[in-house]
Amino acid sequence: MTYRTLCILAFTALISACSSRPTGPTTPPPESVSAISKWETSGRVGIRTKNDAVSGNFNWQKDPKTFALSIVGPFGQGATHLNQSNDGVVTLAYEDTVVTGNNPETLLQQELGWEFPVNQVTYWIRGLAYPNSAAKISKDPDSQLPNKIEQDGWLITYSNFTKVDGLSLPQKMQVSNPPFRVNLIINQWTIQ
């Protein structure tokens, strides 16, 4: 082999090593909000009960069988973690306490005094009515996005939406059933 041939082969190898390679198949974004099977959201939360008020940051990861919800107060104080594993076991961790059960709503009510319908909120946070009960939905006449859902004794109001992968998802919302009220300001959405 000549010197020139070696240089051409080395240059070709160098160029092909630097070229971009496909990273594998990517999951296309969902075609509708109801088709979102896995999501993560984070932002600010304010929770008001009859006797207490809590504010902080939240992060919520959800896939079809599991979820992990964390609420952390100002300066990292007062962290509360609610998780559901693949086998349906729900764990609530707060302060120095860890309890398990099979129903997130029951754990939150018994341990913290919070009435928070976790199963329904996984739909409401996406701007959808919970499919297993009747709902009254009011929509904005221009955008046709929901501005209010009344369901199971709860009032869900939406005051702002944001576009994520071409879909409109809530950015600011309130879930209330007096005296319990939750305000969410969502800073980030990741969907699949």
Curated annotation (Swiss-Prot):
Check the record and name the Pfam families matching this protein.
Answer: LolB
So where does this one cross the membrane?
none
The places in or outside the cell where this protein is found are: Cell outer membrane
Name the lipidated positions (S-diacylglycerol cysteine): 18
User: How is this protein situated with respect to the membrane?
Assistant: Lipid-anchor
Q: Where is the lipid attached (N-palmitoyl cysteine)?
A: 18
Q: Tell whether Methyltransferase is among the UniProt keywords.
A: no
Keywords linked to the UniProt accession: Cell outer membrane, Chaperone, Lipoprotein, Membrane, Palmitate, Protein transport, Signal, Transport
What does the similarity note say?
Belongs to the LolB family.
Assembly and partners?
Answer: Monomer.
What does this protein do, in the record's words? Plays a critical role in the incorporation of lipoproteins in the outer membrane after they are released by the LolA protein.
Q: Which HAMAP family match?
A: LolB (MF_00233)
Name assigned to this protein: Outer-membrane lipoprotein LolB
Species lineage: Bacteria, Pseudomonadati, Pseudomonadota, Gammaproteobacteria, Oceanospirillales
**Could you tell me the gene encoding this protein?**
lolB
